[in-house]
C-alpha cells in the first residue's frame, strides 16, 4: 500500500515517466507477493527497469512483469568462473544455468544488461577472462564491467585487509580514478 502511494505520488506530482527498482532482491518475492505487485503496478501503468540475479528469473515472473510494464532488467552476474564465484562470492550457480535463465527475458521482449566485476582479491588474469567467456554465451543487449570495491562491513573487505591489500582505515568509493587495492 505504501509502495503504491509513493509510486502514484511521483507519477502525479513529479510527472515521473519511468521507474527503476534497484534491488537485487526484487524477484525474491513469493508468487502471492508477485501477483499483488503486478495487480498494483497495473494501475501505475509506467514502464520500469529492475535489477535482479539470474537465478531469480523464470517464465512465470518475467511473463507477468512484462505485461505490467517491465521494460529492462539488469542482472548481477559478477564473475564467470563457477568455482571462484562460489568460493569468493558465495554464489553457487552453474554457468549453463545462468545462460539458460538469461534466454527467458528475450521470449517476452524484455531487454537486459549483465553486470560483471573484475579486480577481486586473488583473481588472476585467467579468471578474469572466464568472465569474458561467459558473457560471450549470453545474448545481453549490454554488458557492463565494474571494478571491485571493498566496502566496509563485507566479507571481501575483511579478506582484503587480511591479505594486506587495503588498510582498515581506508574509505572506499564507488567511482574512482585510481586503483584501491595495494
Question: Where do the model's predicted regions map?
Answer:
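Catalytic histidine-centered segment of alpha/beta-hydrolase-like enzymes
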Residues: 28
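Acidic, low-complexity intrinsically disordered segments
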Residues: 1-8, 12-15
Amino acid at each position: 500500500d505504501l509502495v503504491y502511494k509513493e509510486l502514484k505520488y511521483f507519477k502525479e506530482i513529479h510527472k515521473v515517466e519511468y521507474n527503476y527498482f534497484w534491488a537485487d532482491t526484487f524477484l525474491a518475492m513469493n508468487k502471492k507477493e508477485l501477483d499483488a505487485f503486478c495487480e498494483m503496478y497495473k494501475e501505475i501503468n509506467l514502464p520500469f527497469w529492475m535489477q535482479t540475479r539470474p537465478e531469480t528469473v523464470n517464465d512465470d515472473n518475467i511473463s507477468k512483469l512484462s505485461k505490467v510494464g517491465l521494460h529492462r532488467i539488469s542482472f548481477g552476474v559478477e564473475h564467470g568462473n563457477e568455482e571462484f564465484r562460489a568460493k569468493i562470492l558465495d554464489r553457487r550457480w552453474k554457468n549453463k544455468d545462468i545462460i539458460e535463465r538469461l534466454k527467458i527475458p528475450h521470449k517476452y521482449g524484455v531487454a537486459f544488461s549483465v553486470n560483471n566485476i573484475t579486480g577481486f582479491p586473488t583473481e588472476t588474469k585467467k579468471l578474469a577472462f572466464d568472465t569474458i567467456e561467459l558473457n560471450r554465451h549470453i545474448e545481453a543487449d549490454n554488458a557492463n564491467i565494474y571494478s571491485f570495491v571493498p566496502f566496509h562491513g563485507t566479507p571481501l573487505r575483511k579478506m582484503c585487509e587480511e591479505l594486506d591489500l587495503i588498510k582498515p582505515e581506508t574509505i572506499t568509493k564507488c567511482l574512482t580514478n585510481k586503483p584501491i587495492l595495494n
